């Protein structure tokens, strides 16, 4: 089986077209729902019957929340704390989307392996931080496109380059996540495929290598969620403060 077959989208429930749009419930739709369900259950497990002396699950959820809050404060200071709910939601969605795709479930699918999903998420972040910048700084927000001390003769070129760089942010954010998920899952699938045809002597070593690779892929999944949120906070910092 092709290692790229795991990225194919196919309908699970066929629905009538909506003004010419295909709105079938696909394997991608299923795993998006599962991602939200798992992320919601994770948070619910942390707050359900919360105690002054937290149990293991409550402690773990609090550690994750504190970790995300630390990223926000490290990039944006206390002013960024107001946006903690959204940043936490983005972090958990990316994290669980990456991890759920690695579970041995039927029709296992990683939604973040498709650029349309990551680009949509990146556009939400991009529009959000842009609106925050316009609200906080007003017309002064556009000053970020012309660095202080820029000579007048080169100002038009600098503005053009800065605007292009700003508009490219969601694209780079989406491509980075998608490329890493595709590469990691493809390599894992290819190497795992070598375990079956190898001899009994080599198979245990191959299996051990696959286990190590899975652990590494889990690390990459968590790292990509961290990078996505870190860059989101960096962009938020640009919108909150004049530079």
Curated annotation (Swiss-Prot):
Keywords: ATP synthesis, Cell inner membrane, Cell membrane, CF(0), Hydrogen ion transport, Ion transport, Membrane, Transmembrane, Transmembrane helix, Transport. It holds the Pfam family ATP-synt_A. The chain crosses the membrane at residues 28-48, 52-72, 83-103, 114-134, 141-161, 177-197, 200-220, 221-241. It is found in: Cell inner membrane. It is a multi-pass membrane protein. PROSITE patterns: ATPASE_A. GO terms for molecular function: proton-transporting ATP synthase activity, rotational mechanism. InterPro entries: ATP_synth_F0_asu, ATP_synth_F0_asu_AS, ATP_synth_F0_asu_bact/mt, F0_ATP_A_sf. GO terms for cellular component: plasma membrane; proton-transporting ATP synthase complex. F-type ATPases have 2 components, CF(1) - the catalytic core - and CF(0) - the membrane proton channel. CF(1) has five subunits: alpha(3), beta(3), gamma(1), delta(1), epsilon(1). CF(0) has three main subunits: a(1), b(2) and c(9-12). The alpha and beta chains form an alternating ring which encloses part of the gamma chain. CF(1) is attached to CF(0) by a central stalk formed by the gamma and epsilon chains, while a peripheral stalk is formed by the delta and b chains. Belongs to the ATPase A chain family. Key component of the proton channel; it plays a direct role in the translocation of protons across the membrane. This is ATP synthase subunit a. It comes from Neorickettsia sennetsu (strain ATCC VR-367 / Miyayama).
């Amino acid at each position: 089986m092709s290692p790229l077959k795991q990225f194919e989208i196919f309908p699970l429930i066929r629905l009538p077209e909506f003004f010419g749009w295909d709105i079938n419930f696909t394997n991608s739709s299923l795993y998006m729902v599962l991602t939200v369900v798992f992320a919601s259950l994770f948070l619910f497990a942390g707050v359900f019957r919360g105690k002054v002396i937290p149990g293991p699950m409550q402690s773990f959820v609090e550690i994750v929340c504190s970790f995300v809050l630390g990223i926000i404060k490290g990039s944006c200071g206390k002013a960024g704390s107001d946006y903690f709910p959204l940043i936490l939601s983005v972090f958990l969605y990316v994290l669980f989307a990456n991890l759920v795709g690695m579970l041995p479930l039927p029709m296992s699918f990683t939604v973040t392996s498709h650029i349309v999903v990551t680009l949509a998420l990146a556009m939400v972040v991009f529009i959000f931080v842009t609106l925050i910048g316009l609200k906080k700084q007003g017309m002064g927000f556009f000053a970020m496109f012309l660095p202080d001390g820029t000579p007048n003769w080169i100002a038009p070129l600098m503005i053009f380059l800065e605007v292009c760089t700003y508009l490219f942010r969601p694209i780079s954010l989406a491509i980075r996540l998608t490329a890493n998920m595709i590469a990691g899952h493809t390599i894992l699938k290819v190497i795992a495929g070598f375990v079956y045809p190898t001899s009994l002597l080599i198979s245990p070593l191959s299996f051990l290598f696959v286990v190590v690779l899975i652990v590494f892929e889990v690390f990459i999944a968590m790292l990509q969620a961290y990078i996505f949120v870190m860059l989101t906070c960096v962009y938020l910092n640009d919108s909150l403060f004049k530079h």
